[in-house]
Amino acid sequence: MSAQSPQVRQPPATPTYILRGHAAAIHALQIFHQNLRLVSGDADGWIVVWDLVSKRPRATWKAHDGTVLEVKGFSFGNGAVTEVFTHGRDHKLRVWRFSLQDEESLQKVLPVDIEKTSSTAASQPWLVHSLPVNALNFCAFSMVFLPPDKANTASDASEAPKENTSLSSVLIAVPNALNSGAIDLFHLPQERRICTIPADTEVQTGMVMAANLVISPSGELYVASAYEDGRVMVHGCRGSLQEKDLTQSTKTPWKWEKLYVCRAHSQPVLSLHVSPAGNYFFSSSADAVLAKHPIPSLGSPGHAPEELPIRSINTKHAGQQGVRIRSDGKIFATAGWDSRVRVYSCKTMKELAVLKWHKDGCYAVAFADVDVFEVREKSDEEKPTVSPNDNGNQENQLAGRAETEFSLATVHRQRYEKVQNTHWLAAGSKDGKISLWDIY
């Protein structure tokens, strides 16, 4: 009789919720609006904006005629207005907008319940921008918001009416339409190309597979990119972004310098993601390797690019994609072709958890933001307390407070705060389902 192991085995993790609504594979996910909304995109071009409190759709529409490569959602005015950026295999990058009042009239029938013969154009959000971009690479777009003063300058230079432009001023990186190894940078709301990062002339990298924009604290723009031959690179643009001319009259080319190049993978790179601090990034590939890379700062001109990764591990699990780092920079997750979601430590790259529920391969993951609540908790602590000597009304105030605590409004607020404080990890699969996990 074998001796029993003294180690207590923990039960396997199970998802907290399953969101069923897509009829095709989930390719893009993002949690936004202080963790109250989740936006998802599938292989049929459908977008669903979910309410994470009720776990029901707030808006559904067919954004593209092809697969959705990436989707990003943002809320403005404390949720009064929502903008959704979508990138499809139909070679379109689109920006959609709807207000809180519009949500009542928007279509909420989920894609899995919509008949193919029914109209897909009704009750859509307002299409603000539609840019023709390259989508042959399977490379999703990356975006950064411009600093406020730079955004104002760019907006002043645009002749488009304010109501016909996006609420935000952003730079967007996509693969070049003519050279699949080059990267184009576009500006919104101007809807024009600002510059191009040329393909590497020393080696044949193949197509751009992933890109990520980041602005340093000093205002310099960096682009981390990954390629078909397994290489990853970092390019930096010398000079603060504030000094760049984004107007339509610009003739001065942006000067990009290659700061880092490393062939960390033997297969095409599937994804990369830059840390919240902007000082490193992770890459994943069709092989089993995960790599952590530096983002070197711009040194003296002509300095040779760095070539050594910070750390590289062989996970023995090929085909991990959709790598995402959580907002606190402590953990990151990958979506696996083997249907498993894996969670790793950012510091040690040690595997912390393997989440299995889906039967088919997973393509996308998304984290909830975990650092937006310190401000709210601090503001709650700073609320004035009731003095026991205030006009002798302490008893009445306590009674009123007790009544308020059990009011429907308070219950509603508590539901919202519970959702906002949950450390969600969302995973999207080929089966069209989205699993929500509460971990770490």
Swiss-Prot record:
Predominant place of localization: nucleus
Subcellular location field: Nucleus
Swiss-Prot/TrEMBL keywords: Chromatin regulator, Nucleus, Repeat, WD repeat
Statement: the UniProt record of this protein carries the keyword Nucleus: yes
GO cellular component: nucleus
WD repeat segments: 21-60, 66-107, 205-245, 264-303, 315-354, 406-440
Alphabetized Pfam families for the sequence: WD40
GO biological process terms, semicolon-separated: chromatin organization
Entry annotated with the keyword Repeat: yes
Subunit note: Component of the ASTRA chromatin remodeling machinery complex.
Function: Component of the ASTRA complex involved in chromatin remodeling.
Similarity comment: Belongs to the WD repeat ASA1 family.
UniProt name for this protein: ASTRA-associated protein 1
Taxonomic source organism: Aspergillus niger (strain ATCC MYA-4892 / CBS 513.88 / FGSC A1513)
Lineage: Eukaryota, Fungi, Dikarya, Ascomycota, Pezizomycotina
